[in-house]
């Protein structure tokens, strides 16, 4: 679920940036998304959105699905349980790892999506 996703982000980025800083970043980080991603981090969000879309096609509810995971060496690791839980956990874990590798550009936070996306 979204709270677990936030915790995964903190695991992967070693708590270096609050989760809320990713909620209104670029064209895809946060609710919805459209246009061309502004950078690598925004592409991580686009991929995460697409993954959630695939989860929904499988009949899962990714924003609400609870799953089991651990933070091991700043890497989110999913604990297999059931199809929806595994799929959503993998979406979130891959996004959290992607966020940790991508550069955060302050100029891409809270942008005007109508003109830039």
Swiss-Prot record:
Q: Which cofactor does it need?
A: Ca(2+)
InterPro entries reported for this sequence: PLipase_A2, PLipase_A2_Asp_AS, PLipase_A2_dom, PLipase_A2_dom_sf, PLipase_A2_His_AS
Q: How is the cofactor bound?
A: Binds 1 Ca(2+) ion.
For Ca(2+), which residues are the binding ones? 28, 30, 32, 49
Give the GO terms filed under biological process for this record. Answer: arachidonate secretion; lipid catabolic process; phospholipid metabolic process
Q: What class of enzyme is it?
A: hydrolase
User: Is Secreted set as a keyword in this record?
Assistant: yes
Q: What residues sit in the active site?
A: 48, 92
Write down the chemical reaction(s) this protein catalyses.
a 1,2-diacyl-sn-glycero-3-phosphocholine + H2O = a 1-acyl-sn-glycero-3-phosphocholine + a fatty acid + H(+)
Supply one GO CC term from the record. Answer: extracellular region
Q: Where in the cell is it found?
A: Secreted
Question: What Pfam families does this protein's entry cite?
Answer: Phospholip_A2_1 (PF00068)
**Keywords from the UniProt entry:** Calcium, Disulfide bond, Hydrolase, Lipid degradation, Lipid metabolism, Metal-binding, Secreted
Keyword set includes Ubl conjugation: no
Q: Which domain of life is it from?
A: Eukaryota
Disulfide bonding pattern of the chain: 11-71, 27-117, 29-45, 44-98, 51-91, 60-84, 78-89
Cite the SUPFAM superfamilies for this sequence.
Answer: Phospholipase A2, PLA2 (SSF48619)
Primary site of residence? secreted
Q: Name one GO molecular function term.
A: calcium-dependent phospholipase A2 activity
Q: Family per UniProt?
A: Belongs to the phospholipase A2 family. Group I subfamily. D49 sub-subfamily.
What is the name of the protein in this document? Acidic phospholipase A2 PA-1G
Q: Which organism is it from?
A: Pseudechis australis
């Amino acid at each position: 679920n979204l709270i677990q996703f936030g915790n995964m982000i903190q695991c992967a980025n070693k708590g270096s940036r609050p989760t809320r800083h990713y909620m209104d970043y670029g064209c895809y980080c946060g609710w919805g998304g459209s246009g061309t991603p502004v950078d690598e981090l925004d592409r991580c969000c686009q991929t995460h959105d697409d993954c959630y879309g695939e989860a929904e096609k499988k009949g899962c509810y990714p924003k609400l699905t609870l799953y089991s995971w651990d933070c091991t060496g700043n890497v989110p690791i999913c604990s297999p349980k059931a199809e929806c839980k595994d799929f959503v956990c993998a979406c979130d874990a891959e996004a959290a790892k992607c966020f940790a590798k991508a550069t955060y550009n302050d100029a891409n936070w809270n942008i005007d999506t109508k003109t830039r996306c």
